[in-house]
Amino acid sequence: MLINIKNKDTLTIDEFTLKCCVGKNGFTKNKFEGDNKTPIGTYKLGSVYYRKDRVNQPITKLKKKIINFNHGWCNDPKNKFYNKEIILSKKNKGEKIFRKDHKYNYFIEIKYNSTKTKPYKGSAIFLHLTKNFKPTAGCIAVDFDSMIIILKLLNKKSKIRIC
């Protein structure tokens, strides 16, 4: 199954056309940390992460991971765990994925810059939730109902094609 991001506000999967939003500064073939752009390319999908205190276990064929209070994603290009899931500590700092808002109640890792990770080339690129469709820091976001549809359709061989 292929998720296709056709433009800044349209995602297609199977016979579904869904509303989405992308990075504030659009798309790029040359992503770097903090540019607020969504990376162009075709990428594998990683695990689906979810807050079991807020949402049900997702119905999907992807690997599922529960988000705990101390979970984070390393966005420090100088850290050996750059662009990896981490347990937050004084030593390992990063983006908190156990958030007060709803954005990461469900999210899917997009395997951008994940194999042979290159520092400063961008981190924490996810397909996550939104309520207002405001542009993101580089991720792709959909509403809750769309995420449920997407999760049900995906399998371990699924990919996402951005532009």
Labelled PLM ranges:
Residues 142:
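A conserved hydrophobic position in a structured secondary element of the catalytic/binding core
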